[in-house]
A protein has these predicted regions:
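Long, amphipathic alpha-helical surface segments
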Residues: 109-185
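Flexible, low-complexity segments enriched for small/polar residues
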Residues: 3-4, 8-12, 16-133, 141
Length: 185
């Protein structure tokens, strides 16, 4: 079996991939199940975001990974599944079984629900908003989640402008005292 750090990383990657699935990075990628085409939460930076101290979950990640593998062993036993002993238990589950286990861990009434939901939210945030990066930096790097949602690069001055109004009309004129940076005077 791998080192504790490798077990933690692959387990958390498998959890992130369960939340926002993506394609395998390489043929023998066990953490990413390959359940969806294109990049998912892992490629979008889920582990980078989870290891950002501002999330408040960083200190608990080793415990969460260990707990997730324990839950996976129990799940496998309850469902008469044989797990590959060379992999962390959660990583060894199929995508369908990972999803079923995460669904039970995040269900109303589960005593650990808050922790698993928090972890899921940060995995989503890594894909949906690139919360671990400045938006312009993420766009310049080709962040997969932002690109999938249609974000475009800012103008040369770093500001986003939209030539077409969402309601097909300008809702308000810019206040005459607005500064060049867009701030009110």
């Amino acid at each position: 079996m791998d080192s504790d750090e490798q077990i933690e990383v692959s387990t958390l990657e498998a959890y992130a991939d369960t939340i926002v699935p993506g394609e395998k990075r390489f043929p023998d990628d066990h953490a990413i199940a390959g359940a969806s085409p294109g990049p998912g939460a892992v490629v979008a930076g889920a582990l980078e975001l989870l290891h950002t101290e501002a999330t408040g979950v960083t200190v608990g990640l080793p415990y969460l990974a260990e707990s997730l593998n324990h839950h996976a062993k129990v799940y496998a036993k309850e469902h008469d599944l044989t797990l590959d002993a060379s992999l962390p238990s959660f990583v060894a589950l199929s995508f369908e079984d990972r999803t079923a286990l995460v669904r039970s861990l995040t269900a109303p009434g589960h005593p650990e629900k808050d922790g698993w939901v928090s972890l899921a939210l940060f995995c989503n945030m890594s894909f949906d908003s690139a919360a671990h990066k400045h938006t312009a930096e993420a766009i310049a790097e080709g962040h997969p989640g932002l690109l999938a949602m249609g974000y475009t690069a800012p103008d040369e001055d770093g500001l986003w402008r939209f030539p077409k109004f969402s309601y097909r009309r300008e809702l308000a004129r810019i206040h005459p005292d607005t500064t060049p940076s867009g701030s009110p005077a």
